Amino acid sequence: VAGKGGVGKTSLSATIVKTLVQTYPDKKILAIDADPAVGLSTALGIEVKHTIDDIRKDVIENVEQGNNKQAIDILNEARFRIYDALVETDGFTFIAVGRPESAGCYCKINSYLKDIISILSEEFDYVVIDGEAGIEQINRRVMEKVTHLILITDTSKKGRDVCATIKN
């Protein structure tokens, strides 16, 4: 789910997750909060202990501290830790991107998120992604694995322009 900010993307994403859980109780469903505003966890009543950004920061810290591990070991550990960030609930699994502390571009976290979506999407029947407002995740092909994209907006020119840009 993508589009303009403040128009209900998170509410729609939560509704889709709940509907999938009720309609397909035997299917594996993953909800991804890809919005740094971190609202999907609240909408779904999830308590998040570890986020994707927490894992990314830990990996960077290990490298910066001169950890003697080989690069492949660090990558394998990062991949394994993704599963630590998953929150298992009744009927679905949840993971959150978190709120990167630095201002500006979320390039690094979005690149990591893209890899995580690629890894996890193979393990679930349905993956619902609550995307951040605007076009950055679309432009960076974070949602490259997406088969269906719902664009949500209001009637403002800015909102229509965001959706038109994403659509094109």
Task: Tell me what each language-model feature is.
Residues 3-4:
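P-loop (Walker A) phosphate-binding loop of NTP-binding proteins
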Residues 12, 16:
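Hydrophobic positions on the alpha1 helix immediately C-terminal to the Walker A/P-loop
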Residues 21-88:
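N-terminal phosphate/diphosphate-binding loop that engages ATP/GTP or pyrophosphate donors
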Residues 22, 108-168:
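Conserved catalytic-core segment of NTP-binding enzymes
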Residues 28, 91, 148:
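Residues at the starts of beta-strands that form the adenosine-phosphate
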Residues 36-38, 99, 133, 157:
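Short, glycine/acidic-enriched loop or turn micro-motifs at the edges of active sites
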Residues 75-84, 88, 93-129:
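Cytosolic-facing regulatory segments adjacent to core modules
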